[in-house]
Amino acid sequence: AAGVNRPDLMQRAGLYPPPPGAPVTLGLEAAGEVVEVGSGVTRWHVGDKVTALLAGGGYAEYALAHEGAALPIPAGLSMIEAAALPETVMTVWANVFESAALKPNETLLVHGGASGIGTTAIQMARAFGARVFATAGDAEKVKLCEKLGAHRGINYRTEDFETVVRDLGGADVVLDMV
């Protein structure tokens, strides 16, 4: 299974060049069964079910992934569902947890809370015990953010998010992928 995300669409339109050496076949996210592993690979074995972030080639029948760019497919998820995870999960993990080192009981402000990255950030931060505020551009998107776990959704068209966040105690980490 393959995910389809904005960079795939931009590559197809010629607006986002693939990395040097990447396959010409589109597809930055894929999920499937490991059919072969390279020498020195210890994390994965033939038959493992994985989802991976790729430089390209995810739309092909077979794709090549670095072992560090693959994740086990969580129990209960289909291949199709899992194929939609790598780009957002790895982006949020790298930015929020590795770079910014968000910790339990800290507060994360997510701009664009109803986006793919935003919805993933809300859920991951909550799962790790953080308090979450999320901005969005209309009432429906604010409700979605709160349904996904944001403690407070902020409609930036009708509220001054800086004032709201300050009044609620501030934020330790800000994720702005907009």
Residue ranges and their predicted role:
Residues 1-3, 13-57:
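Glycine-rich beta-strand-centered segment in the early N-terminal region that forms part
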Residues 6:
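Helix-loop element at the rim of GNAT/NAT acetyltransferase active sites that forms part
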Residues 167-173:
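A glycine-rich helix->loop->beta "capping" turn
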Residues 39, 75, 137:
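Short, conserved catalytic or interaction motifs in soluble domains
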Residues 83-159, 164:
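Mid-domain Rossmann-like dinucleotide-binding core that forms the NAD(H)/NADP(H) cofactor-binding site
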Residues 23, 43, 49-114, 147:
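NAD(P)H dinucleotide-binding glycine-rich loop of Rossmann-like/cofactor-binding domains
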Residues 34, 63, 92, 125, ...:
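Terminal peptide-recognition signature
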